[in-house]
């Protein structure tokens, strides 16, 4: 692998001043550096990856053992080595294919849980399961991290399919979040879902207790309108939640990969079991493509290799995810956790510190909003930010098709502008038409130069349906896997979240005035004194 890394770096240094636009002298450039899956088109031709770089990157994936580790993951081997666990979120959307963990086929239990979820959701949506004041009108999902970001993102993304109760999401331990969410709801017609595998997550359980007290202001049996997504049956029972409304999932499903199963309960309630199954089917379709397509035609592999080229070879520390689809507004935040919690590591699988950078910083906002915020830096800033655009050919509002056309034209224009830029000669010509001359024209022209030659990709799809969203989410999940394998990282643990939790527990009695700040650094002690209740 070392030789391939070195060859990639040498090639990048040889071509880094080449214009990406120059690559389009090849009339087949766009076709050759694009990949399709059904109605999905991934165009990565507006990057500085040429045939040589592409071939080297594919060789890198082969040398890293991506194919072998891919099969190990799908087969239930314990590829999460630091925790001794399999990584089988894919089984949640492929329940008809037997998978063994420790010699036991896990799919019958998955099918049973899925059927229980469907039955509960159908009862709730039909009115057979009611609140103590009538049919359920609102559902509040209380969870954090993977118990929140995925289903919250998906519920917004699939709003046109949401014909069930209104779904709300509470994650932050800040009391303002649950207060603002509950204040306009009726406890007598609200279901609360507490999503915590261990039923001990401090933010989630604090909010759950608050919701229970709120529920008690209107109903005689608050726990009767609670459901739980948890494996801690003793704790859910102690909370008062009937076992029929408790849905568990195994430790081989990581939190940020879990919305395909019981963590997606709120999503299933919102869009119904049939649409939820279409979401699963979309993910399963991407799984099959990932397992079967050769690397040169494999969307997750190519998306990962493009990301590695930009981050590891070109040295671009961030990437912007820019969905030109307002209902994907929460996708960048979801991908922040998926990618940064998975591949934001400094230690390799073998326990040694990495000799290269780990994954990039992921951020973004939907278009066209971002154009009026941070695109200035993307176009004219001194650092290059690779951009990943997403756009649908068709919207859900036929009477507003003219607005969708404007949205799409803006997406394509931004991608083209990053590629082409604007030269000083072109800037002078524009200003001359406005009547500027002489030194003022020259001064202004320099501010209107766009360097261009900035890489971007476009993921285009027909329409944001449940199946399409499933394909998109699974695509990014597998991208994380491929990048992690090549970087030598365990993408499925998250020890970086632990230290802050431990310190917060120790700080709480200090802030309450029950303990002193001995042993704390001067800054922390000063802040405790200022913020002490």
Curated annotation (Swiss-Prot):
Subcellular localization(s) per the UniProt record: Cytoplasm
GO MF term (any one): carbohydrate derivative binding
Catalyzed reactions: alpha-D-glucose 6-phosphate = beta-D-fructose 6-phosphate
Active site: 341, 372, 501
InterPro entries registered for this protein in UniProt: G6P_Isomerase (IPR001672), G6P_Isomerase_C (IPR023096), Phosphoglucose_isomerase_CS (IPR018189), SIS_dom_sf (IPR046348), SIS_PGI_1 (IPR035476), SIS_PGI_2 (IPR035482)
PROSITE patterns the UniProt entry points to: P_GLUCOSE_ISOMERASE_1 (PS00765), P_GLUCOSE_ISOMERASE_2 (PS00174), P_GLUCOSE_ISOMERASE_3 (PS51463)
Residues of the signal peptide: none
Broadest EC class assigned to this enzyme: isomerase
Pathway named in the protein's UniProt entry: Carbohydrate biosynthesis; gluconeogenesis; Carbohydrate degradation; glycolysis; D-glyceraldehyde 3-phosphate and glycerone phosphate from D-glucose: step 2/4
Name of the protein in its database record: Glucose-6-phosphate isomerase
Organism: Cereibacter sphaeroides (strain ATCC 17029 / ATH 2.4.9) (Rhodobacter sphaeroides)
């Amino acid at each position: 692998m070392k030789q391939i890394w070195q060859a990639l770096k040498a090639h990048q240094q040889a071509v880094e001043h080449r214009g990406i636009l120059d690559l389009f002298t090849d009339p087949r450039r766009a076709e050759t550096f694009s990949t399709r899956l059904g109605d999905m088109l991934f165009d990565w031709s507006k990057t500085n990856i040429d045939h040589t770089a592409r071939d080297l990157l594919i060789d890198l994936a082969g040398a890293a053992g991506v194919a072998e580790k891919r099969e190990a993951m799908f087969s239930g081997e314990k590829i999460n080595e630091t925790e001794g666990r399999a990584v089988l979120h894919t089984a949640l959307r492929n329940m008809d294919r037997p998978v063994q963990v420790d010699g036991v086929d896990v799919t019958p239990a998955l099918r049973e849980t899925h059927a229980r979820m469907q039955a509960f959701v159908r009862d709730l949506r039909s009115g057979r399961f009611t609140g103590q004041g009538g049919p359920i009108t609102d559902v509040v999902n209380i969870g954090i991290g993977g118990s929140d970001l995925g289903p919250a993102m998906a519920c917004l993304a699939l709003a046109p399919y949401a014909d069930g109760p209104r779904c709300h999401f509470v994650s932050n331990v800040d009391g303002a979040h649950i207060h603002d969410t509950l204040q306009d709801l009726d406890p007598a017609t609200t279901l609360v879902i507490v999503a915590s595998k261990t039923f001990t997550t401090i933010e989630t359980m604090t909010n759950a207790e608050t919701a229970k007290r709120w529920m008690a202001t209107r109903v005689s049996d608050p726990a009767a309108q609670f459901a739980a997504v948890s494996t801690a049956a003793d704790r859910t029972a102690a909370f008062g939640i009937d076992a029929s409304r408790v849905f568990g999932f195994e430790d081989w499903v990581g939190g940020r990969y879990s919305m395909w199963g019981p963590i997606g309960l709120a999503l299933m309630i919102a869009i119904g079991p049939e649409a939820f199954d279409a979401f699963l089917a979309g993910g399963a379709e991407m799984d099959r493509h990932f397992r079967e397509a050769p690397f040169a035609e494999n969307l997750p592999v190519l998306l990962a290799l493009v990301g590695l080229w930009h981050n590891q070879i070109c040295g671009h520390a961030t990437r912007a995810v820019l969905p030109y689809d307002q209902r994907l507004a929460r996708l960048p935040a979801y991908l922040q956790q998926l990618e940064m919690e998975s591949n934001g590591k400094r230690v390799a699988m073998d326990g040694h510190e990495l000799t290269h950078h780990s994954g990039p910083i992921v951020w973004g906002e939907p278009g066209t909003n971002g154009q009026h915020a941070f695109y200035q830096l993307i176009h004219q800033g001194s650092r290059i930010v690779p951009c990943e655009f997403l756009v649908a050919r068709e919207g859900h509002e036929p009477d507003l098709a003219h607005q969708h056309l404007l949205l799409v034209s803006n997406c394509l224009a931004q991608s083209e502008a990053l590629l082409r830029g604007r030269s000083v000669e072109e800037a002078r010509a524009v200003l001359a038409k406005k009547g500027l001359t002489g030194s003022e024209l020259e001064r202004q022209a320099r501010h209107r130069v766009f360097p261009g030659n900035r890489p971007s990709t476009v993921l285009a799809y027909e329409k944001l349906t449940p199946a399409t969203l499933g394909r998109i989410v699974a695509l990014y999940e597998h991208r994380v896997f491929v990048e992690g394998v090549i970087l030598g990282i365990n993408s499925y643990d998250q020890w970086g979240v632990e230290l802050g939790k431990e310190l917060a527990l120790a700080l709480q009695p200090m802030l309450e005035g029950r303990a002193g700040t001995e042993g704390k650094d001067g800054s922390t002690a000063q802040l405790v004194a200022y913020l002490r209740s």
